[in-house]
Design a protein with these regions (language model features):
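Acidic, mature catalytic/reactive cores of soluble proteins
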Residues: 1-247
Length: 247
């Protein structure tokens, strides 16, 4: 914004601030294998191996990649622990955090603890954040993983047969805001027709997996991230100035 407004003074100020934040994130937020989520007022970390609940949170890991603020090797390591602790191949969900808030008596994170453990933000799949996990793998150039997890959270793949539909209990054509983790409701969708996830899924699928990006007044570039796995595909571009069909 500062560049667009030709505001040199504030641009320089914020660039210095950015480097200050980056330096101190690496110094104070790295937990040894992943990034911590936050700190309580008394200095107790959240999203740390020290915690009883919420030892790891996906947001700090995915955004270390998306923001380009995290050290690249640390960010890659952090995303490997997202796979280990937050991706559930049995339920086909990507949990927001683990373990859910339910055991610790000391740490009070706020309203999130009001949800039953394994529901919505409290240890279930919060799909907005799950999409950022997909984007993070895409931005790391790990196309096969990005495609795998894109398909994992795609609602059509939670409704392939009658048993799936009875478990998921939502529409196959819209994104669920959340998916439960805890049995006997594991794999059940929560709210639908509600989440900004839809826009992120569209963006990740089109711009990163298919590699279609627009450049103002310069045209388009197509560089698929996972061409072999995707196979042939077709794009149509229709607006007031042009109509293209690209195969």
């Amino acid at each position: 914004i500062c560049t667009y407004m030709n505001d040199v003074e504030h641009k320089e100020k914020y660039l210095k601030m950015k480097e200050f934040i980056r330096e101190h994130l690496e110094k104070n937020a790295w937990d040894g294998s992943w990034y911590r989520r936050a700190y309580f007022d008394d200095g107790t970390p959240l999203g740390s191996k020290e915690n009883i609940d919420c030892k790891i949170d996906s947001l700090a890991q995915s955004w270390s990649v998306i923001s380009h603020a995290g050290d690249l090797e640390k960010a890659k390591k952090a995303m490997s622990f997202v796979e280990k602790y937050l991706i559930d191949d049995n339920l086909n969900i990507i949990k927001l955090l683990s373990p859910p808030f339910e055991k610790s008596k000391k740490e009070e994170p706020g309203y999130i603890k009001g949800y039953v453990a394994g529901v919505r933000e409290n240890g279930g799949q919060y799909t907005h954040a799950a999409t950022w996990v997909v984007l993070a793998f895409a931005k790391l150039g790990m196309g096969e993983k990005a495609l795998k997890y894109f398909n994992m959270i795609n609602p059509i793949n939670h409704t392939k047969n009658k048993d799936d539909c009875e478990k998921y209990k939502l529409e196959p054509y819209v994104m669920a805001a959340d998916v439960y983790m805890r049995e006997p409701h594991g794999g059940r969708g929560g709210w639908s027709w509600y989440t900004g996830t839809a826009g992120w899924m569209y963006k990740v699928g089109l711009e990163w997996l298919l590699g279609f990006k627009t450049y103002k007044n310069e045209g388009y570039k197509i560089n698929p991230l996972v061409l072999d796995s995707l196979g042939d595909f077709e794009l149509e571009i229709n607006n007031e100035k042009e109509n293209y069909k690209i195969k």
